[in-house]
Amino acid sequence: MTGTYTTNELERIARAVRFDTVAAIGHLGVGHIGGCMSIVELLTVLYFDAMNVDPADPKMEGRDRFICSKGHAGPTVYATLSRRGYFDRGLLWTLNVGGTRLPSHCDMLRTPGIDMSTGSLGQGFSCAVGAAIGSQWAKDGATIYTLVGDGESQEGQIWEAAMLAGNHHLGNLIAFTDRNRYQLDGDVEDVNGLEPLADKWRAFNWNVIEVADGNDISEVRAAVREAQALRESGKPTMILLRTVKGKGVSYAEKLGAANHNANFPPEETVKALNEVAGFDCVTEEDVRTAHFPDLLERRVE
């Protein structure tokens, strides 16, 4: 899959993913808007440039896997999967309603393309380590990708799994930290500081790649390719992404820690969607009725 799309094409896809994520959360009226916005570029690069997956066969043997350990960012995962062709875009407007296939947190029993149920912080990362060990045993050539939040990185389970991954020389494991610096209770460094974070990962026998702008497609793409090239190093790789919580949505960016799980009223949703689109294309009635334009003329296959 690597190299199929130009940077400009990936940026266009990312804009559509961001728009659809905002639309889904806005139609519901509440959600983890901040932590969803900060990872849009990463997921776009993974699913449209890096990962060996087949939407027509979500359980394909030897496929790469992505486990979103910060499971509250499920809406962005869903928007990305929809754009990649796993299911119809209209399903996004059923986010977290009764009987939906798209609960607020990732659920492998409900949603095509989800490889692990997550939400209890720290557990998804541990499962990714286990999946990487299993892939090594199976010799299937797969790469396991996983994403943790920086607030989540205060969980002891993260570091137990990190130690195991380093000791088992999991070169087939690439992890990301969404370093947006905010958690539910405030600034991560004020609540329970992580720095020097890169040194900590190196001490656990991991390669570390630091990305100055984790919301820049080119920088994220380059980091992922660098990590892929380190597969034979015998070490897992952690990519630290410095991101902006709520990226691309002024309302969400200003909320800081308050946007961990925030109300998203129709009037703010309209502003946000028009801001992301770059032109006026949505009304409050559209938000209520889930009548949202498609920023891409066609689904990207």
What residue ranges belong to the model's regions?
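Conserved AdoMet
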Residues: 86, 90-108
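Glycine-rich ThDP/TPP pyrophosphate-binding loop and its adjacent helix/strand module
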Residues: 53-59, 63-65, 105-296
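Non-catalytic terminal/interface segments that mediate subunit docking, oligomerization
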Residues: 297-301
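Alpha-helical support elements that line or immediately flank enzyme active sites
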Residues: 75-87
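Active-site catalytic microenvironments for nucleophilic, acid-base chemistry
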Residues: 45-49, 83-84, 133, 164
